[in-house]
Regions:
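Short, Lys/Arg-enriched, disordered terminal segments
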Residues: 1-4, 19
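Sec-dependent N-terminal signal peptides
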Residues: 3-12
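A "functional boundary" signal
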Residues: 14-216
């Protein structure tokens, strides 16, 4: 979480005091030090899941293993995450299960956002029916949409497009915050994005907010 929030607010570090900058960079160094250990553990889990997928007999079981593989890859290897998101869609089609299909589409949406394929992401978004989603799936979807519009706002600085995308980002953040447990990992991530993308909040306050929610 700290790594994510650091990257979200890093452009404001130059406006902070030297002590604040040192504090934030110390957190980043700590997170980078854990990267190799984290990746090795991920690869071990992925290998086990692939073996399970190879021997899985039911389509339901195959779907959920593909979904788990997507989740394992989604944090660091987006092309592989895309492969298993697509496989999940194929399994959901065979099962004719609307809720599983919406979840798989949401996974595909994440892959397109992560790859910067925003047009493809919008196309997938327009196919998603949130009325078929569980609360948990809606939490994930609203979070993804807030990030999509955050990226579009960053890519389109000209008005009226920039303000339009900022407003949509803020609106999806609000939707996510309404159904996320307050103070949770996901809640703080969305709140950080809402704070970061709000043009009315000075950079000093954004950095102070970052320090507050990452304080152990």
């Amino acid at each position: 979480m700290r790594m994510f929030l650091f990257l979200l607010l890093v452009q404001f570090v130059s406006t902070a005091s030297a002590s604040r900058t040192d504090s934030i960079l110390t957190i980043l160094d700590s997170e980078l030090g854990k990267k190799m250990e984290y990746r090795m553990e991920k690869e071990k889990q992925i290998s086990t899941l692939k073996q399970s997928l190879f021997v899985a007999s039911s389509v339901y079981e195959q779907y959920f293993i593909c979904d788990k593989l997507y989740n394992e890859y989604s944090s660091y290897q987006f092309d592989s995450a895309y492969v298993y998101a697509q496989k999940s869609i194929e399994k959901a089609e065979l099962l004719k299960n609307d809720e599983l299909m919406e979840s798989a589409k949401s996974n595909l949406l994440f892959c397109f956002i992560s790859a910067g394929l925003f047009k493809d992401a919008i196309d997938v978004m327009q196919e998603i029916n949130t009325s078929r989603m569980s609360i948990r799936q809606k939490q994930i979807f609203y979070d993804q949409m807030s990030r999509l519009y955050s990226e579009l706002a960053r890519e389109n600085m000209k008005e009226p497009y920039h303000r339009k995308y900022v407003n949509l980002c803020q609106a999806y953040c609000d939707s996510a915050l309404l159904i996320l447990p307050e103070g949770s990992y996901e809640y703080n991530n969305v709140l950080a994005l809402k704070t970061y993308t709000n043009p009315d909040i000075p950079s000093e306050k954004k950095i102070a907010f970052y320090e507050r929610i990452t304080d152990p």
